[in-house]
């Protein structure tokens, strides 16, 4: 459960991401594909090379979903319901992959926002991404 301080930290950190959200989303995906090659199996139709338009496009989708979650932090299940349905019923993404992408997102944010990425912000973002992952996998049951 996100505390009021966590919510404040997440909103402030995501605010610093600003117009770079899509870029950071794509970078996190690239990190995931390189660090955890089995995740590539969900994207057989993508050009997974560095800077590809498809990875950039999906990175923007990831970032847009996170922006939506930040904006609806008190009601993520409702806000992310359609996305949860998509990943559970159509795409059938293994839930562990959300944890892998979350880790890569944290690394990407730490690399780009070193001054803002304090231990407290790190912990808040980790809890937030875990909450998003829980929501996205809630319809698997």
Curated annotation (Swiss-Prot):
One of its GO terms (biological process) is hydrogen peroxide catabolic process. Keywords: Acetylation, Heme, Iron, Metal-binding, Oxygen transport, Phosphoprotein, Transport. This is Hemoglobin subunit alpha-A/Q/R/T. GO terms for molecular function: haptoglobin binding; heme binding; iron ion binding; organic acid binding; oxygen binding; oxygen carrier activity; peroxidase activity. It holds the Pfam family Globin. Red blood cells. Heterotetramer of two alpha chains and two beta chains. One of its GO terms (cellular component) is blood microparticle. The modification N6-succinyllysine is found at residues 7, 11, 16, 40. The keyword Iron applies. Heme b binds at residue 87. InterPro entries: Globin, Globin-like_sf, Globin/Proto, Hemoglobin_a-typ, Hemoglobin_oxygen_transport, Hemoglobin_pi. The modification N6-acetyllysine is found at residue 16. Belongs to the globin family. The modification Phosphoserine is found at residues 3, 35, 49, 102, 124, 131, 138. O2 binds at residue 58. Involved in oxygen transport from the lung to the various peripheral tissues. The modification Phosphothreonine is found at residues 8, 108, 134, 137. The sequence shown is that of alpha-A. SUPFAM superfamilies: Globin-like. The modification Phosphotyrosine is found at residue 24. Residues 1-141 form the Globin domain.
